[in-house]
Regions:
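Beta-alpha-beta core module
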Residues: 39-46, 51, 107, 113-163
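Secondary-structure junction motif
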Residues: 30-32, 71, 75-100
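Short beta-strand-to-loop elements that line the ligand-binding cleft
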Residues: 1-6, 101-112
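Flexible hinge/capping segments at coil-to-helix
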Residues: 37-53, 57-79
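A bilobed periplasmic-binding-protein/Venus flytrap-type ligand-binding module shared by bacterial periplasmic
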Residues: 56-63, 155-166
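Short amphipathic alpha-helical coupling segments at ligand-binding clamshell hinges
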Residues: 165-176
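Central regulatory/effector-binding core of bacterial HTH transcription factors
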Residues: 1-33
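Beta->alpha turn/N-cap motifs
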Residues: 6-7, 23-30, 58-59, 123-124, ...
Length: 177
């Protein structure tokens, strides 16, 4: 089975032996801090993917009519964001300020299914997230666009304890990712 959670909880679950594998997502600029932390805890890690976030919004959104979306187009929209401002050895307040800059309207969510439902039912919402499959976009009636302004590179990393050996099933799972 799998459990959707945030980076800090994923790390805690691995440390407490509640799971064998975890996936952690972070901005590439923090790569060294994360790797140092992983190594200090005896974790092994493998890069799954690197990506630049994309904008995702409902097909009924006014943004859907634009080929290029800029930050100014988002001013009157409601941002949906994940509540995961964790970076090892950096104060949470500093990360929150940098990763979630002040906006007039933001809804902070924990799970992806709630986020997808909100996007599909509220044309005033958007999220800046990892690329989403065509199947998922079609299922929820969503549109994806690249933000006109440059965005930060992000990484998704598989994480597991140093004493754990990946199984054939684990490898098959990673191939599917």
């Amino acid at each position: 089975y799998y459990r959707e959670t945030n980076s800090m909880r994923t790390i805690k679950n691995l440390l407490q032996d509640e799971c064998r594998l975890g996936i952690v997502r972070y901005a590439a600029e923090y790569d060294r801090k994360y790797k140092d932390f992983f190594e200090s805890k005896g974790f092994l890690y493998e890069l799954i993917t690197e990506f630049r976030p994309v904008l995702l919004f409902g097909a009924d959104s006014s943004l859907a009519r634009k080929e290029t979306v800029s930050l100014s187009n988002l001013a009157e929209k409601i941002e949906l964001a994940y509540a995961d401002p964790y970076v090892p050895s950096v104060p949470a307040g500093e990360i929150k300020k940098k990763e979630l800059p002040e906006r007039l309207r933001r809804i902070v969510l924990f799970d992806r299914s709630s986020l997808l439902e909100l996007l599909s039912h509220n044309p005033d919402t958007f999220v800046c997230t990892s690329p989403v499959s065509e199947d998922l976009r079609r299922r929820y009636g969503l549109i994806s666009r690249t933000l006109a302004e440059p965005s930060k590179q992000h990484r998704e990393v598989l994480l597991y304890r140093g004493d754990y050996k990946l199984t054939e099933f684990d490898r098959a799972f990673l191939t599917e990712l």
